Amino acid sequence: MMHSAKNVCRTCMDETGTLVDIFANVRDPVLDEPEMSLSHILARCTERPVKRGDLLPQFICVSCVLAVQNAFRFKWQSEQSYQHFFRVLNQSGAPENQVHLAACNGDKNQIINQKMQLKSDRQQDTQQMTKTQKPDDDLSQKQTLQAKLQEGNIDGPPESFTLHPRKRTCRTEEQADMIPKEATRSTKMICDADGYYNCPHCSKRFCSQTQLRTHITDLCNRCPYCPRTYMQKSNLKRHLRNHLSKPAHKCFHCSKAFMRKDHLKRHLRTHDSDGPLSCSQCSAVFIEHVQLEIHRREHKQRPGSSKSESTKDPDSDDSDQAQDLKPKWTKNTFNGTCSIPPMLKPKPICDICQKKFSSVYALKRHMLTHNRQHHLKKCTYCSEEFKTEKHLKRHERGHMGDLFRCEFCSLVFVDVNYLRKHKKRIHSNNVIAM
């Protein structure tokens, strides 16, 4: 128990990341200083003693190493710049006593500001502690923590500590299951004093519960092997099969294999031009062999082949076999006509560019591109053209001077809807006051 309690980060108390010995020597490539111990860097940044063999953990995670290096780098840079300006003031001929006086005043003001900040922080901490704890709880809590550290029976940080959870990515399905479903679905999330909703897994804040739920979903349902994210966990599990399982749907034209059947069907379309899925009598192509066989039967019942079929004996075996190959369409009980399957219906073709479309509606939309020049509305004041009469009238207001001016600022708009959106977005406080 004592060993597991010590194998945590000294600064963020994280035990899942990569831990580094706090007394290891590191060298910052940005600074000119030689290698120094992490404990020395941490002590200079936090102004807390770091000694080997104390009761606190002797490790620090990699992210905290980067953070403390950045802090030490900033402190070192500030000291270097201060020394540089001090040398410049000496070289400029300023009296030495004024230079030292300015430096002393600057240091004195800095010390006073630090003391005032520490005093205010202590007062805030004292007020928070008095609301939640009794006066004697602080001493007893320290004694309890020290006793637990010596015995190795510590399970987590005390309640008085303020933990800032770090952003983590759910790399496996087991880690994704650790996040409760109530946190993303039915649980009512409580906002803080500033009106923001804090993420329970990282330090981000959001203005609404919807944004927070979307963020949690993006954080948890993320693929650990690629940057894809999914709204539902079932879609993530189906996607993980692409990384973990072997493809089961193999193409019988080439050596490719796919995890899903619809992906295989999509791939088979590339073999339509030269594979067995293209009809030998026409240019029709199909995805499955069943569709191709039905299409071939359609060629056998056309009028071109009726002459050869009429010369045969209706009682012969060949005629029976040909009769079996004929497609048996289902008759419509309302008008007595045969209902042809949608895959065998001829696709609509554009008369101008000979393009094929999946539906008549798609063909009509395409025809608008050819007739665009006939339907454009031209402005009577300039050479601009517009698709609709509404856009043309809105444009002509600018020529006639019929504009909408904002009464709060000097902006002018062509459409009254634009003016309303502008007031709502920019002058919302003034509109409410009126």
Swiss-Prot record:
GO biological process, one term: regulation of DNA-templated transcription
C2H2-type Zn finger ranges: 197-219, 221-243, 249-271, 277-299, 348-370, 377-399, 404-427
Entry comment describing in which tissues the protein is expressed: Primarily expressed in ovaries and absent from testes. In ovaries very low levels in germline stem cells and cystoblasts but abundant in developing cysts and polyploid nurse cells.
UniProt xrefs under InterPro entries: C2H2-ZF_domain-containing, Znf_AD, Znf_C2H2_sf, Znf_C2H2_type
Disulfide bond entries: none
Keyword Repeat tagged: yes
Gene Ontology molecular function: chromatin DNA binding; chromatin-protein adaptor activity; DNA-binding transcription factor activity; sequence-specific double-stranded DNA binding; transcription cis-regulatory region binding; zinc ion binding
GO cellular component terms, semicolon-separated: chromosome; cytosol; nucleus
Residues given in the record as Zn(2+) binding sites: C9, C12, C61, C64
Comment text on domains: The ZAD domain is required for dimerization. Possesses 2 arrays of C2H2 type zinc fingers. The first, consisting of zinc-fingers 1-4, plays a major role in DNA binding, while the second, consisting of zinc fingers 5-7, only has a minor contribution. C2H2 type zinc finger 4 is required and sufficient for interaction with rhi/rhino but is not required for DNA binding.
Cited function: DNA-binding zinc finger protein that recruits chromo domain protein rhino/rhi to specific chromatin regions enriched in H3K9me2/3 histone methylation, mediating piRNA (piwi-interacting RNA) biogenesis. May bind to GC rich DNA sequences including a 5'-GRGGN-3' sequence motif. Nucleates rhi/rhino accumulation and stabilizes its expansion. Involved in piRNA transposon repression, particularly in the female ovary during oogenesis.
Record's subunit section: Homodimer; mediated by the ZAD domain. Interacts (via C2H2 type zinc finger 4) with rhi/rhino (via Chromo domain). Dimerization is required for association with DNA and interaction with rhi/rhino.
The protein's name: Zinc finger protein kipf
Organism of origin: Drosophila melanogaster
Lineage: Eukaryota, Metazoa, Ecdysozoa, Arthropoda, Hexapoda
